[in-house]
């Protein structure tokens, strides 16, 4: 199982990544990878260095009952160093396990858009992008241009500033959350409220997760 509030299971056929934008400063996966390496786990012997795990590809086929599955919680499926041929293998497993619903979240929206420009999105995949600041709202447009009948979602986590006006055309779900821990950058309650109001106006589902905020936030 997983502590991530908006999913049920995680599947990591890739581990490791590189910091890509300001939301990566206090990366949970980076810290956890170092810890797991120190514990001697073979899968994490490379620490946070990008690593493909072919042996992990078949794992979802062993899960009997349907699950909501977050893909690559310890990496980014659309990292620039992940070959499209390997992503094809991941998608083949997804298609062969229609009982599961897979959530794919990326900070590399332009690569995801390029990948799906020549490929169909599997019927059991939700696609999402991370938008933590105003300067990264361009990622939303890349998500919107992908042809899919399935859920498109935004993860505004960690939310680092007021995002301003959002075009949520074709977006089904928005997740908002702040950082946790002693060095967490504070999230202001009015930033969250503004996103919530825009979601309500544009008929988009809204979900908040744990947050370090100035003021309490509880809107689920």
Model-identified regions with their sequence ranges:
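N-terminal [4Fe-4S]-dependent radical SAM core
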Residues: 1-70, 76
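Generic intrinsically disordered, low-complexity segments enriched for polar/acidic and small residues
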Residues: 8, 25, 41, 45, ...
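Glycine-centered flexibility sites
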Residues: 16, 23, 177-178, 212
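Conserved AdoMet/S-adenosylmethionine-binding subsite of the radical SAM
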Residues: 52-211
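C-terminal accessory extensions appended to soluble enzyme cores
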Residues: 213-220
């Amino acid at each position: 199982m997983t502590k991530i509030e908006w999913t049920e299971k995680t599947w990591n056929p890739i581990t490791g990544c590189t910091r890509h934008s300001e939301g990566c400063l206090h990366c949970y996966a980076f810290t956890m990878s170092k810890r797991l390496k120190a514990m001697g786990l073979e899968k994490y012997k490379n620490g946070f260095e990008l690593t493909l795990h072919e042996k992990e590809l078949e794992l979802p086929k062993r899960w009997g009952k349907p699950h909501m599955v977050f893909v690559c919680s310890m990496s980014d499926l659309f990292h620039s160093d992940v070959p499209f041929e390997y992503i094809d293998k991941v998608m083949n497993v997804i298609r062969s396990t229609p009982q599961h619903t897979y959530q794919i979240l990326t900070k590399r929206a332009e690569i995801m858009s390029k990948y799906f420009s020549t490929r169909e999105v599997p019927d059991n995949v939700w696609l999402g992008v991370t938008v933590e600041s105003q300067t990264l709202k361009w990622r939303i447009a890349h998500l919107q241009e992908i042809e899919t009948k399935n859920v498109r979602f935004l993860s505004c986590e960690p939310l680092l500033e007021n995002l301003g006006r959002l075009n949520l055309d074709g977006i089904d779900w928005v997740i908002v959350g702040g950082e946790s821990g002693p060095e967490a950058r504070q999230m202001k309650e009015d930033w969250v409220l503004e996103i919530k109001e825009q979601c309500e106006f544009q008929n988009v589902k809204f979900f908040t997760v744990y947050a370090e905020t100035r003021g309490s936030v509880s809107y689920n």
